[in-house]
Design a protein with these regions (language model features):
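Active-site-adjacent helix/loop segment of glycosyltransferases
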Residues: 8-9, 13, 17-92
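Conserved glycosyltransferase catalytic-site signature
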Residues: 1-7
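Terminal low-complexity segments of carbohydrate-biosynthetic enzymes
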Residues: 52-53, 74-122
């Protein structure tokens, strides 16, 4: 989720030029190719990888302190939201915020980006 940012930072460090096309337009249709039965699982996957990538990117380019500053508010927010959705029994949202927590913890502890969606169901 931070591929463009990572590429940008690496170019800056190597003093390479970056070109911006100001009038470019991209028509991105989100997860329009994903079957409806997989949408929830893909959303969980997206949230896990977003949080994992956040810590990984900031640690790689700016160090652990900056990475912690970026993810600690997200960690506390995800934890509180997960508790809230447990209390009100919203399983879908609980899974999303559990995935966010898992992504952050896995990145902080140095684990590789291992999470994959469970899309084997028919």
């Amino acid at each position: 989720y931070f591929e463009e940012n990572d590429f940008y930072e690496r170019c800056l460090k190597k003093e390479k030029s970056i070109f911006l096309i100001k009038d470019s337009k991209i028509n991105h249709k989100g997860n329009s190719s994903v079957k409806n039965i997989f949408k929830d699982e893909i959303e969980i996957n997206r949230n896990w990888h977003l949080m994992w990538s956040t810590f990984y990117f900031y640690e790689k380019h700016f160090g652990k302190i900056t990475a912690y500053k970026k993810v600690l508010p997200k960690l506390f927010s995800a934890f509180l939201k997960m508790l809230f959705f447990i209390i009100i029994n919203n399983k879908k949202k609980r899974k999303i915020y559990s995935a966010r927590l898992s992504g952050i913890f896995n990145s902080i502890t140095g684990n590789k980006s291992w999470f994959r969606p469970n899309i084997t169901k028919l």
